[in-house]
Design a protein with these regions (language model features):
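Membrane-interfacial, low-structure loops and terminal tails that flank and connect transmembrane helices
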Residues: 1, 167-171, 212-222
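Start-transfer (signal-anchor) and selected internal transmembrane alpha helices
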Residues: 1-23, 218-227, 231
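Membrane-water interface of alpha-helical transmembrane segments
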Residues: 3-10, 82, 92, 96-99, ...
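Hydrophobic alpha-helical transmembrane segments of integral membrane proteins
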Residues: 5, 9-10, 19-20, 76, ...
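Membrane-embedded helix bundles of polyisoprenyl
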Residues: 13-14, 107-117, 121-211, 226-245
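Membrane-interface coil-to-helix junctions
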Residues: 16-110, 129-154, 261-264
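Hydrophobic residues in alpha-helical segments
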Residues: 25, 50-52, 163-168, 211-215
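Conserved, charged catalytic cores of large soluble enzymes
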Residues: 205, 210-214, 243-262
Length: 264
């Protein structure tokens, strides 16, 4: 319990994010590098405009001859974090709130992960700065779905660590449920591959964290049960996005084409 408590030192990542995003707030500008400017912002703006008109953004008539907008996972219209676009602010302001909120979430979740592994408070804050504001994550402002998944990744890893611990049925249920919810948020945020990578990480973490005495570790059968339960919860919560995307993908050119696109 002590390790999960917040520290005043977390003001440091908050102030760092404020220093980065502050000038954008003052000038009313958005970073439009690469995919953000020509894909994500127009897509999110279209969704924002339809919601403001009281129309569910299920179909887009702006691409090709029309396409199922809700089936495009990168649109992430079912992601709960999109409630930030319902704030009584301009689209640009809502977009900045969305970006800065996920940067802050990445820092907080990294802090929690580091503390769970026994890192000191100052070390956990340093870890949160290194990950949340490091180049690999910070540059994802131009590829927003990956920023969203990166913000939830540390929490997912910490929950994987928890389900690997021997515990009673009551104690083991919570992290399994929380992991399922977190995986669903990653999928709904637009990056289903990250959720798959987290699941693939579970047996690896189990292997590297196995105790010297096998009897004190969690049995493989119980680990399989917990992993399966978490995946089922994630699928149930993210099915509203997964099923339309899967159905739409069946009519895509990659599905229809019989040969590989590459020369290999």
């Amino acid at each position: 319990m002590e390790r999960s408590k917040l520290s005043p030192l977390l003001l440091i990542p908050f102030l760092a994010i404020l220093a980065i995003a502050g000038p954008l707030w003052v000038s009313g500008e958005l970073p439009v590098f690469r995919d953000a400017g020509h894909f994500y912002y127009p897509s999110f703006h279209y969704e924002h405009a339809l919601w403001n008109q009281g129309i569910a953004p299920l179909w887009s008539s702006l691409d090709d001859l029309g396409r199922p907008f809700a089936a495009d996972s990168s649109a992430s219209i079912f992601y709960p974090g999109k409630f930030l676009f319902w704030l009584p602010l301009s689209f640009a302001s809502c977009m900045l709130v969305y970006l800065t909120a996920h940067l802050l979430l990445a820092c907080l979740n990294t802090y929690y992960l580091a503390r769970q592994f026994g890192v000191s408070t100052s070390g956990a804050v340093l870890a949160s700065l290194s990950f949340g504001l490091g180049g690999a994550v910070l540059t994802q402002h131009s590829n927003i779905i990956y920023l969203v998944s990166a913000s939830w990744l540390p929490l997912a890893i910490s929950l994987v660590h928890r389900i690997l611990q021997p515990s009673t049925k009551t104690d083991s249920a919570r992290p399994v449920i929380y992991l399922g919810v977190t995986l669903a948020l990653i999928v709904l945020g637009g990056d289903a591959q990250m959720a798959l990578h987290v699941v693939l990480l579970i047996p690896l973490m189990h292997w590297f964290n196995r105790p010297k005495e096998k009897k004190s570790g969690i049995p493989y059968r119980k680990l399989t049960q917990r992993t399966t339960a978490a995946c089922l919860i994630a699928f149930a919560l993210a099915a509203i996005q997964v099923l339309p995307t899967y159905e739409w993908a069946q009519s895509g050119s990659r599905k229809i084409r019989s040969s590989s696109r590459t020369t290999y």
